[in-house]
Amino acid sequence: GQPLIFDYKPGNAGGVAMDLIAKAPADGYTLYFFDSGPLTVAPHMGRVTYDVNKSFTMLGHVCGSGSMLVAHPSTPFKTVTDVVATSKRESDKWSYGTSGVGGPHHLSGEYFKSVTGAVLLHVPYKGGGPAMADLMGGQVPLLFSSLGPVVSAAKAGKVRPIAVTSLKRSNAFPDVPTFDELGYKGFESVAWYGLMGPAGMPADVVARLSRALTKVGEDKAVMEQINATGCDAEILPADQTLEKIRADSAKWGKVIKDANIKPE
């Protein structure tokens, strides 16, 4: 193996890092462990400085993590059916919180509304921490959240898990159903991660890196380490990853347009 230098580049919801990798030398020594948002969501939310289809060399998909619909225990919500039926019946009463406008949990919530017809007002917070605090305190009845913060809160009985937005049940919550198995076939809202480099990387370098990524998927210990982070490991080749980008971009573009989501 070779040593790796990790260079964290926050800013503009991943846009800063995307711009840097697009302009980096295409020699295989500068790679980006990316999240899907800048490729599938950001282009629908405003102007980006990179071309999703031309600025990068895709290597593959690594893992993905869904959102969870969670309720405060004082609410009447124990199932997705409860949420949909009650919110339709009492259309001016119920809301759901998220970590912010245009993030994966907001998109999960609006996607949920579009598929089920649930009537819920979106309450954006400045981060997942304040959102979870208000859910536990009863200031907001429902929350779309990443799974990590729910674990301890659910064990303490402070929140009630309803359903997860991935197609498979979460390893952390094996008893919590997916929307898909509850009858909303194909319902999936997952923030996922992959590996890519700048456009124009030599074919032999791409092949070597792709083989290395495939070996990661064959290493049970490494896959378990990835799963332990709360991100469900699944190594996919570049062609399947690109197809996933196209499908997700089409889905989120429609959700963003229909819900009139604007960047803050």
Task: Enumerate the language-model features and the residues they cover.
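Ligand-binding pocket segment of bilobal, Venus flytrap-like solute-binding proteins
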Residues: 84, 92-176
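Periplasmic solute-binding protein
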Residues: 40-47, 62-76, 110-115, 192-195
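C-terminal lobe and pocket-closing loops
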Residues: 64, 78, 150-218, 247-250
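Residue-level signal for nonpolar/aromatic packing positions in well-ordered secondary structure
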Residues: 6, 21, 31, 45, ...
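N-terminal (or domain-start) structured segment
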Residues: 1-54, 93, 116-144, 153, ...
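A structural signal for short loop-to-beta-strand junctions that line the ligand-binding cleft
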Residues: 29-31, 50-68, 94-97, 161, ...
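An extracytoplasmic/periplasmic, membrane-proximal ligand-sensing/linker region
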Residues: 114-116, 203-264
